[in-house]
UniProtKB/Swiss-Prot annotation:
Disruption phenotype: Severe paralysis at the 1-fold stage of embryonic development followed by an arrest in elongation at 2-fold stage. Loss of myosin and actin organization in embryonic body wall muscles and loss of muscle cell polarization. RNAi-mediated knockdown in post-hatching animals causes paralysis associated with severe disorganization of body wall muscle actin filaments and defects in egg-laying associated with embryonic hatching within the mother (the bag of worms phenotype). Residues 26-1154 are extracellular. Residues 1178-1226 are cytoplasmic. Required for muscle development probably through the regulation of the actin-myosin cytoskeleton. Component of an integrin containing attachment complex, which is required for muscle maintenance. During the formation of neuromuscular junctions at the larval stage, negatively regulates membrane protrusion from body wall muscles, probably through lamins such as epi-1, lam-2 and unc-52. Required for distal tip cell migration and dorsal pathfinding. Required for egg-laying. May play a role in cell motility and cell-cell interactions. Plays a role in vulval development. GO terms for cellular component: cell surface; external side of plasma membrane; integrin complex; M band; striated muscle dense body. The gene is pat-2. Heterodimer of an alpha and a beta subunit. Interacts with beta subunit pat-3. Interacts with dep-1. Component of an integrin containing attachment complex, composed of at least pat-2, pat-3, pat-4, pat-6, unc-52, unc-97 and unc-112. The lineage of its organism: Eukaryota, Metazoa, Ecdysozoa, Nematoda, Chromadorea. It is a single-pass type I membrane protein. The chain crosses the membrane at residues 1155-1177. This is Integrin alpha pat-2.
Length: 1226
């Protein structure tokens, strides 16, 4: 359900904005900062507050690379220095604590030589005072000592302790011990003073010194008695597994066993297998416990790099804050593009370890930094109670966080549960002073009220830019209040106030809001606040507005920036002045729009308050302005419900149910009907359903075509539907949302029909998933939501049933075994009768076929190489726009260049042209002959003949397959004398291939001048092992494959599915004595077909010469689908053979005619002759006078157009006379 999701998001956003505002500014003042600066000497490397004189604090700042002006250190190069700086103005002075003049010298033999070196000793690297800031220790961890034998120079380190000023400072070098305990395996590289802590309870006369370099850098803690130089016990040496742990890297004191005496906590950043840890010791250096990270430990995080002690939860027990500056956050940030977790390196973290009982730290709280490479936790310090809420707070330094990596300091407030998990304030170095501070937060200190306002202040060091800053804490103002409606409900039908002339009367109500504030610290008696009222702030579009005339009538009110409307604003601002401790109330009127859609969700509003700060950040009397307490709510919220028909409980619980069914069980691709209807029914069996929406997915490959809702009365209305996003989802689906009613009443049924249309460019190929669900803004019962969604799948199929049929015309041809036709034939009708094979390729549908191929293998030659079915024209295709054919062996079309008499063309076509006329541009280049080129006359003759047939009537044959389908026999044959009509083309023990025949050219020429080709076949016996000379490649079809295909068609009685080796590419008719006709068929829709007819003449002389007794001659056709719009498997190849039966008779006279036909023909001829004689006699034909014989002689040489008579009484023209044909000229 959608209710509540948007309000939760808005609430979360407002909370986040409030948090960010609190983080940016709370009560650490950043406008009036005292910034000290010294460049080039690491000024700010360490610092702490110290009461140099009673009641007069100063900020002691270390500069370990400084050139000291202490006269006792004259000639010492960069020994380092410590400065006492004012807390209220930018002035500092160097403090001289080293009273020894120069380096100490001792006799080495007879010479007095230095036994120590103070140059580059890093004096001021450690500055630490106690809790009361009346004792202080400053150290030089790189101080070197030569020992009594002057054999080594080792960095033992040294420290100076002072109280009540710096005049009586005393030096302690705990690692410098005689007799010689030098060397890295002892104390020589101890660097005593790397860290230090001064206890503050029960007058402990000790200082705790950290020495991380002793004993192969295992590290140690020294308890130095400030009254006795030699009273300096240290922690024990450990086994070698603790080498390089560097205990003493950081140090702090606190009571960890409940005895009231400060104990020691030492940081060990490389301990615990490089995870880091803390080690706790009593004041007498008795080990108590090890503390490790139990929240989110990882290698190299450097836990223990810093440490501080404070009671953060006000339970009277000291808690420990441990810094882990190199912690990497692997989980909180996602990549914007890939949404993968993106590691944030060196963000750092601090772990607050709460002491739940003496010596027991039972709870840990981790606070993680927010800036990569920032090293949050590099420095930590107890800050005191900054906001005066009774809980001590902590400050954390991240010297490389913030803008331009200039550093930042975070304020973490204590609480009864420990600390708040997020910082309350973030102070960036870029916002301090002139904005040029770098490494801000490298060193920290706090818990000292330097301005006397009763609130602790803090100081921050930044060694990289040479700065130390004192930041003051502002007094805190805590605001309380409430906002209430005048009644719990508002009815949009109760229009009780006139808004304006355009909107007329609307339903109006009042909001009552009251505020007051209290102060902590030195706060003024009255303050100005800005109030912001946001109406209906949980809704994306407001439904309630303040009245414009009310806004204009009050000068303290104005339209708020960012208000979603201006004429009648949804947000207003008002500036008010409040008196401390006194409540003040305000009344505002609003109206609810009568045209709102969401009548179920309450109208929420919020009132935010902010304090109006001055530019200087100070009040009259040079006092700091107060800060708003961000630990309490910064806004107040309430709501008013909208009256509805939900009963006394004011809660409507619908019971929605959706069902859906498609108008088909299977979706067929490529059909004319590419639209699918989805019938969706939504029923509400519960109470009113508000903002009821139907969501449905338009599957990939479909386009949305509209929706109609059919009511119970049969009327149709179109609900408003729109896509839920501008882009489809990752699966290519669009989701549409349709409004069904607001509300959809109880027991209402809405039936809808969704229309989707398959895309022509990218149709659906996978099963279609239909998803629909219904939703409303009011929640259902949990057990009724299962029927709010429906999902089902419709399979996708592609069916195009390709059919192939053929027939011969005529089905039988009679030929004489005794009479041969003329050898030198001139016309095509002189070589034999016409034989045509007609093939029909059809698409039964329902899906469309984009392209298909039809390959016809034509028996042009006999086994002896003679012409058999002599092709007289190129194939005829009807309709011509649906396909075209090409004769691959174009030399086999009318190879003798006979004159075509066109006897094969019917004079009266049985049916007129087809009703669909198409136009397709001819592409002659793609049909260019691949093998040979005919003479110009032959090409012209063939083209002229083809044009004649394709431009003539279209022959439409019956579609009845039973009439077209033919039984087929063998393609070509040899005689079997045992049984007539049972023939095979090749004996079982022979196989013919293209290379088994040799061609010889006959030099005789026909009358048209074309060369004749005579083929003399010489069949070869198969060699042993199945190999023979000229065997084709394995991917080429053999003649036996053609024979088997014809046999399959014959046994099946026509067309049959074929999975054999024959294909367009595998059959080479140049070697198999056939003619290959390639046809490409286009765009066959359901029930469309293409006819391909091949016209030939039976070359009877070949049958007579080869003494063929008769049988079947068959052509073979292969058809297959080659392309559709869909990537789906095609049907297998179809084959069929068309046969013409050859019937051999003894002679022409041998035809079995009835005797009475002969008698009748003689009598009719005699009667015609008698009638003709009588007619001529009556006309006097026999009585005419004949001229003399000599005058009848005709001289051909005198009359050029005369006829020549031959000895056989035949006449011919002079230019066509031939003695061999016409005989002797008379």
């Amino acid at each position: 359900m959608r209710e509540g999701s948007f309000p939760r998001r808005i609430g979360l956003l407002l909370g986040l904005l409030g948090l960010l505002a609190g983080v940016a500014t709370f009560n650490i003042d950043t406008k009036n900062v005292v910034v000290h600066h010294m460049a080039g000497n690491y000024f700010g490397y360490s610092l702490d507050f110290y009461h140099e004189q009673k009641g007069m604090p100063v900020l002691v700042v270390g500069a370990p690379e400084a050139e000291s002006n202490n006269p006792n250190l004259a000639g010492i190069r960069r020994p380092g220095a410590v400065y006492a700086c004012s807390v209220n103005r930018a002035t500092c002075r160097e403090v001289h604590v080293d009273k020894m003049k120069g380096n100490l010298k001792k006799l080495n033999g007879s010479h007095l030589v230095p036994i120590e070196e103070k140059s580059h000793q890093f004096f001021g690297a450690t500055v630490r005072s106690n809790d009361k800031h009346d004792k202080i220790v400053v150290c030089a961890p790189k101080y070197t000592y030569f020992y009594s034998k002057f054999e080594v120079i080792e960095p033992v380190g040294t420290c100076f302790y002072a109280e009540n000023g710096f005049d009586n400072a005393e030096e302690f070098s705990s690692c410098k011990q005689e007799p010689a305990r030098h060397g890295r395996h002892r104390l020589g590289y101890g660097q005593c003073g790397f860290s230090a802590a001064v206890p503050g309870k029960k007058n402990q006369n000790r200082v705790f010194i950290g020495a991380p370099g002793v004993w192969y850098w295992q590290g140690a803690m020294f308890s130095q008695n400030i009254k006795n130089q030699t009273d300096r016990p240290n922690t024990e040496y450990g086994s070698k597994e603790y080498d390089h742990d560097m205990m003493g890297y950081s140090t702090a004191t606190g009571d960890f066993d409940g005895d009231g005496i400060d104990d020691i906590v030492a940081g060990v950043p490389r301990g615990n297998d490089l995870h880091g840890k803390l080690v706790l010791y009593t004041s007498k250096l008795k080990m108590m416990i090890n503390l490790t990270d139990e929240v989110s430990t990882q290698h190299g995080q450097y836990c223990g790099g810093s440490v501080a002690v404070a009671d953060v939860n006000k339970d009277g027990r000291d808690d420990i804050i441990m810094g882990c500056p190199f912690y990497t956050d692997y989980g909180s940030v996602k990549d914007a593009k890939t949404q993968e977790r993106k590691p944030q390196y060196d963000v750092g973290k601090v772990i607050v370890m709460l002491q739940t009982a003496p010596g027991v730290f039972g709870k840990q709280i981790a606070v993680v930094g927010d800036d990569q490479w920032g090293r949050f936790g590099h420095a930590v310090a107890a800050a005191g109670d900054l906001n005066l809420d009774g809980y001590n707070d902590v400050i954390v330094g991240a010297p490389y966080a913030g803008k331009n990596k200039q550093g930042a300091v975070y304020v973490i407030h204590g609480s009864k549960d420990g600390v708040r998990e997020l910082p309350t304030q973030k102070i960036e170095g870029a916002n301090i002073g002139h904005g040029n501070i770098k490494s801000f937060g490298f060193s920290l200190t706090g818990n000292e009220d330097v301005d006397g306002n009763g609130m602790p202040d803090i100081a921050v060091g930044a060694w990289k830019s040479g700065n130390a800053a004192v930041l003051l804490t502002k007094p805190v103002v805590t605001v309380t209040g409430q906002t209430e409606p005048e009644s719990a409900l508002i009815s949009v039908e109760d229009k009780n106030c006139d808004v304006d002339g355009k909107l007329g009367k609307q339903a109006c109500k009042h909001i009552n809001t009251c505020f007051k504030y209290e102060g902590k610290g030195d706060t003024p008696n009255d303050l100005e606040f800005d109030l912001r009222f946001n109406l209906d702030d949980h809704s994306p579009e407001p439904r309630a507005y303040f009245l414009q005339k009310d806004v204009k009538s009050d000068r303290s009110i104005k339209v708020a920036q960012g208000s979603k409307t201006r004429d009648h604003p949804s947000s207003i601002e008002q500036r008010v002045r409040l008196e401390k401790g006194r409540q003040k109330c305000f009344r505002h009127r609003f109206f609810a729009s009568s045209t709102m859609k969401d009548k179920l969700s309450p109208i929420h509003w919020s009132v935010n308050y902010t304090y109006v700060e001055s530019k200087t950040g100070k009040l009259r009397g040079d006092k700091l302005e107060p800060a708003i307490d961000t630990t309490v709510p910064l806004s107040f919220q309430n709501k008013i419900n909208i009256a509805n028909n939900c009963g006394k409980d004011d809660l409507c619980v619908p019971d929605l149910k959706v069902t859906a069914v498609a108008d088909r069980e299977k979706f067929l691709l490529g059909t004319q009907d590419n639209t699918m209807l989805i019938n969706v029914t939504v029923q509400n069996g519960g109470e009113d359903s508000y903002e009821t929406k139907l969501y449905f997915d338009v599957p990939q490959g479909f386009e949305y075509g509209g929706i109609e809702s059919v009511g119970g009365d049969g009327s149709k209305s179109a609900p408003a539907c729109s896509p839920t996003s501008d882009e489809p989802d990752s699966d290519g689906k669009w989701t549409f949302a349709c409004d069904l009613g607001n509300p959809l009443p109880a027991n209402k049924v809405v039936s809808s029909v969704v229309r989707v249309t398959a895309s022509s460019d990218k149709p659906p190929l996978a099963p279609i998933s239909i998803n629909a669900h219904v939703n409303s803004s009011n929640d259902e019962e949990a057990h009724t939501v299962a029927d709010n969604k429906v999902t089902f799948t419709i399979p996708v199929d592609f069916k195009n049933q390709l059919s192939l049929n053929g027939r011969s015309n005529p089905e039988q041809v009679d030929f004489s075994m005794t009479n041969k036709t003329r050898v030198d034939a001139f016309d095509d009708n002189e070589i034999g009768p016409v034989v045509s094979h007609l093939y029909q390729i059809s698409n039964r549908g329902p899906s469309e076929v984009d392209s298909a191929t039809l390959d016809i293998f034509w028996p042009s030659f006999s086994t002896e190489g003679g012409h058999l079915l002599y092709i007289i024209t190129e194939p005829v295709v009807n309709p011509p726009n649906k396909g075209r054919c090409r004769v691959k062996q174009l030399q086999n079309v009318n190879p003798l260049n006979l004159r075509i008499t066109n006897e094969h063309v019917p004079t009266e076509p049985p049916v007129a042209k087809t009703p669909n006329e198409y136009s397709r541009e001819e592409d002659d280049e793609s049909y260019e002959d691949e093998t040979t080129t005919q003479s110009q006359s032959t090409r012209h003759q063939s083209t002229q003949h083809q044009t004649h047939h394709q431009s003539g009537p279209v022959h439409v044959y019956e579609k009845d397959e039973e009439k077209i389908r033919q039984n087929t026999g063998n393609w070509q044959y040899v005689e079997d004398k045992k049984k007539k009509g049972d023939y095979e083309y090749i004996p079982d023990d022979q196989e013919y291939d293209g290379d088994d025949f040799e061609e010889e050219d006959d030099e005789d020429f026909d009358r048209a001048g074309s060369k004749r080709v005579k083929r003399n076949p010489t069949p070869k016996k198969k060699k042993k092992g199945g190999e023979h000379r000229g065997e084709p490649r394995s991917d080429k079809a053999r003649f036996s494959d053609l024979r088997e295909a014809v046999k399959l068609s014959k046994e099946a009685g026509g067309v049959v599915d074929y999975k054999g080796p024959l294909s367009r590419a595998s059959v080479d008719c140049n070697s198999l004595r056939c003619t290959h006709i390639e046809c490409d068929i286009y765009d066959l829709k359901e029930d469309e077909f293409v006819l391909v007819e091949i016209f030939s003449r039976l070359y009877t002389n070949t049958l007579v010469d080869e003494k063929n007794p008769g049988g079947d001659i068959s052509s073979l056709a292969l058809a297959r689908v080659t392309s559709t719009k869909y990537n789906l498997p095609h049907k297998p190849t179809l084959i069929t053979a068309v046969s013409t039966n050859m019937n051999a008779i003894a002679s022409e006279e041998g035809r079995d005619l009835p005797w009475w036909l002969y008698l009748l023909a003689i009598l009719i001829g005699l009667a015609i002759l008698i009638l003709l004689i009588l007619l001529l006699w009556r006309c006097g034909f026999f009585k005419r006078n004949r001229p003399p014989t000599e005058h009848a002689e005709l001289r051909a040489d005198r009359q050029p157009n005369a006829q020549y008579a031959d000895s056989q009484s035949r006449y011919t023209s002079q230019d066509q006379y031939n003695q061999g044909r016409h005989g002797q000229m008379l």
